[in-house]
Amino acid sequence: MVTVGNYCEAEGPLGPAWAQNGLSPCFFFTLVPSTLMALGALALVLVLPCRRRDVPSGTEELFWAADSRVAPYALQLFLATLQVALPLAGLAGRVGTARGVRLPGYLLLASMLGSLASACGLWLLVAERRQARQSLAMGVWMKFRHSSGLLLLWTVAFAAENLALVSWNSPQWWWARADLGQQVQFGLWVLRYVISGGLFILGLWAPGLRPQSYTLRVHEADQDVERNQAQSTDRTSTWRDLGRKLRLLSSYLWPRGSPALQFIVLICLGLMGLDRALNVLVPIFYRDIVNLLTSKAPWSSLAWTVTTYVFLKFLQGGGTGSTGFVSNLRTFLWIRVQQFTSRGVELRLFSHLHELSLRWHLGRRTGEVLRVVDRGTSSVTGLLSYLVFNIIPTLADIIIGIIYFSMFFNAWFGLIVFLCMSLYLFLTIVVTEWRAKFRRAMNTQENITRARAVDSLLNFETVKYYNAEGYEVERYREAIIKYQGLEWKSSASLVVLNQTQNLVIGLGLLAGSLLCAYFVSEQKLQVGDFVLFGTYITQLYMPLNWFGTYYRMIQTNFIDMENMFDLLKEETEVKDVPGAGPLRFHKGQIEFENVHFSYADGRETLQDVSFTVMPGQTVALVGPSGAGKSTILRLLFRFYDISSGCIRIDGQDISQVTQISLRSHIGVVPQDTVLFNDTIANNIRYGRIAAGDSEVEAAAQAAGIHDAILSFPEGYETQVGERGLKLSGGEKQRVAIARTILKAPDIILLDEATSALDTSNERAIQASLAKVCTNRTTIVVAHRLSTVVSADQILVIKDGCIIERGRHEALLSQGGVYAEMWQLQQKGQETVSEDSKPQDIA
């Protein structure tokens, strides 16, 4: 009968690793299978959530063709299956040749872990082939290679078989083939070498992932539908683009350009290493105190040991390393680094938002964008803190604990700690990955809820106009209910995770404590060793209890980073060409030559638009709504790039000069003036930030708003409110004119600047605008034709084309579209005048 003896051949700890001219078999066959099992589990965790769940529909026929690459994949599958069975066959061989000898425990561990690791590789091999078939069926292009986790697993397995050769001269191994047992083990090693080598070579080729390995028939009518379905599936694992995310984080971990902060980072990393040493030394000194007390040691030795223990405990903190002197010092020093990180991320995002095009901003909700910025900033700082000072130290403590118990106690203790910690981490990652979809859905609904509230409050007046308060509250209530439903799912899944973690920790502590108590009763360990084990394990489990929280927070931050990365990946639509120089302004001549432009929908907004504005002239753009008048102004300001043609200022193509220099010469007075939630003075000063108070007042006087400002209780320091809602329409328009006067541009663009005002305000502001436009090249978009009768040239635009051009009198004499528009507006004014006359009720 075969029985199991000590973990290693000789009773005692796992080490030394090197003995008798070779690696210790106990050490080798503990390290290698454990490493392979860890790699296999990690590969499963990272690859499983990333697998596409789409499957080909019934309108597709997918079958394997008899080509030259089916055989290599069949060989690969056969070798992977053999690799699963071989460790168990090796154990059976040892049992058959043992002949009454007690087998060491490490052989059982090596067989089980080796077989499980190979099973992970086999499952990944089949899963990746299935994913490749489904991806190609959807029309999704993919790289025909295995995942990094699977390749790493096969590489390490093959490297381990080669590593065994360094023990060729060791009598502990089977190279001599002196008896049947050694001959069997040598034969199994040859099989392992051939199998692992074959899988390594075939893995680099990946024959099962090649498109030639099968024939796909897809009905063309369904192909686009399936591709769209593939693109609309749920987002993949939070570990997608992990390398890119970590590279971004590392750039903020090491504060470039600040030697002082770099030195602080090094100090913090050193303090983190000191914390790891304290976590080992504190239980050791506690054990020594117990042993000294039980052995009735002299007071001098006991006092010194107790003093040292208390000092180390002071440095470490309350058993978790979270409240000790070292940890608090590290937290204090890290504040500046964290502020540097937060500032860098916020500035990068804010700068990127201003670099994006007007087209992008018009298609986004401001509330959602700001939420993405807030979450992205907090996610980067949180990730740095959790990864550097929580996750990495916790993993380091686990590895140190496994090594310590294996070397100084017994390999069974190291095995218990390893299995318990591995199972804990594996279940934590798997369950948390499962929870990720609930968190994502909750985040999406939170964005919707926030955007709905912001949209309603921004349109406060409109809500009041239509007595829609109840409707808005009901919409908001429905959004909150949806959010809370998703929040409940996320919280309930958290309870499942916590209970799973608690069960694993309890079982591991029970097994280790019973084993330690047994060895103490057998007098193989001292009472102090039992105390050390309990103290160390409890100390190890304390941060491990938080590992689930750390992982969840990291995953949450990665989820929050996804939207931030999407935002950062938005390409700038309008950007300066390489080598662009400043605009050299001379007189201000504007030329549009055969300009074509279309928005994202593909419909051409402007078609072959050509005109010239001479220096100092005023050109008016008139026509029906949607004709493309405002688009011309936006193209000149370069909010968009034209599809074809050319726009020049003083003979220079505006696409070849810097945007900053171009816009510094252009002033815009829009129809809907939006002011910042700041003082009137600062809103005017926005035209030229460096302007003094006297210049601001002079601009206000020129715009005809100085006296109105002085009538306010706080004068120029009056807050205008969000979007300038505290000012009337005419007052806001005059502030915008004053802002433009202060900028003193060479070219003026007026986009229906007075169309939303009453007649009296319109006339007053027209007078102010006339002062601004004197001796400046001006383009006016006008709705009321009476405001542009004195323009040097009037362009009539319809459906993106210039259909008429000339002065007011010439266009009237032509009797075309302009004359018709003029007559309609004149009749409208006459009707208003008649309606406004007092009537006799009697």
From Swiss-Prot:
<keyword id="KW-1003">Cell membrane</keyword>
<dbReference type="GO" id="GO:0042168">
    <property type="term" value="P:heme metabolic process"/>
</dbReference>
<protein>
    <recommendedName>
        <fullName>ATP-binding cassette sub-family B member 6</fullName>
        <ecNumber>7.6.2.5</ecNumber>
    </recommendedName>
</protein>
<comment type="subunit">
    <text>Homodimer.</text>
</comment>
<dbReference type="GO" id="GO:0098849">
    <property type="term" value="P:cellular detoxification of cadmium ion"/>
</dbReference>
<keyword id="KW-0496">Mitochondrion</keyword>
<feature type="region of interest" description="Required for the lysosomal targeting">
    <location>
        <begin position="1"/>
        <end position="205"/>
    </location>
</feature>
<dbReference type="GO" id="GO:0005741">
    <property type="term" value="C:mitochondrial outer membrane"/>
</dbReference>
<dbReference type="InterPro" id="IPR011527">
    <property type="entry name" value="ABC1_TM_dom"/>
</dbReference>
<keyword id="KW-1133">Transmembrane helix</keyword>
<dbReference type="GO" id="GO:0015439">
    <property type="term" value="F:ABC-type heme transporter activity"/>
</dbReference>
<dbReference type="GO" id="GO:0035351">
    <property type="term" value="P:heme transmembrane transport"/>
</dbReference>
<feature type="binding site">
    <location>
        <begin position="623"/>
        <end position="630"/>
    </location>
    <ligand>
        <name>ATP</name>
    </ligand>
</feature>
<dbReference type="GO" id="GO:0005794">
    <property type="term" value="C:Golgi apparatus"/>
</dbReference>
<dbReference type="GO" id="GO:0031901">
    <property type="term" value="C:early endosome membrane"/>
</dbReference>
<feature type="topological domain" description="Lumenal">
    <location>
        <begin position="94"/>
        <end position="106"/>
    </location>
</feature>
<keyword id="KW-1278">Translocase</keyword>
<feature type="topological domain" description="Cytoplasmic">
    <location>
        <begin position="327"/>
        <end position="375"/>
    </location>
</feature>
<keyword id="KW-0472">Membrane</keyword>
<keyword id="KW-1000">Mitochondrion outer membrane</keyword>
<feature type="topological domain" description="Lumenal">
    <location>
        <position position="397"/>
    </location>
</feature>
<dbReference type="InterPro" id="IPR017871">
    <property type="entry name" value="ABC_transporter-like_CS"/>
</dbReference>
<feature type="transmembrane region" description="Helical">
    <location>
        <begin position="264"/>
        <end position="284"/>
    </location>
</feature>
<dbReference type="GO" id="GO:0016887">
    <property type="term" value="F:ATP hydrolysis activity"/>
</dbReference>
<dbReference type="InterPro" id="IPR032410">
    <property type="entry name" value="ABCB6_N"/>
</dbReference>
<dbReference type="Pfam" id="PF00005">
    <property type="entry name" value="ABC_tran"/>
</dbReference>
<keyword id="KW-0964">Secreted</keyword>
<dbReference type="InterPro" id="IPR003439">
    <property type="entry name" value="ABC_transporter-like_ATP-bd"/>
</dbReference>
<dbReference type="GO" id="GO:0140359">
    <property type="term" value="F:ABC-type transporter activity"/>
</dbReference>
<feature type="transmembrane region" description="Helical">
    <location>
        <begin position="73"/>
        <end position="93"/>
    </location>
</feature>
<dbReference type="GO" id="GO:0005789">
    <property type="term" value="C:endoplasmic reticulum membrane"/>
</dbReference>
<feature type="transmembrane region" description="Helical">
    <location>
        <begin position="500"/>
        <end position="520"/>
    </location>
</feature>
<feature type="topological domain" description="Cytoplasmic">
    <location>
        <begin position="551"/>
        <end position="842"/>
    </location>
</feature>
<feature type="topological domain" description="Cytoplasmic">
    <location>
        <begin position="419"/>
        <end position="499"/>
    </location>
</feature>
<keyword id="KW-0967">Endosome</keyword>
<dbReference type="InterPro" id="IPR039421">
    <property type="entry name" value="Type_1_exporter"/>
</dbReference>
<keyword id="KW-0333">Golgi apparatus</keyword>
<dbReference type="GO" id="GO:0005524">
    <property type="term" value="F:ATP binding"/>
</dbReference>
<feature type="topological domain" description="Lumenal">
    <location>
        <begin position="521"/>
        <end position="529"/>
    </location>
</feature>
<feature type="transmembrane region" description="Helical">
    <location>
        <begin position="148"/>
        <end position="168"/>
    </location>
</feature>
<keyword id="KW-0813">Transport</keyword>
<feature type="disulfide bond">
    <location>
        <begin position="8"/>
        <end position="26"/>
    </location>
</feature>
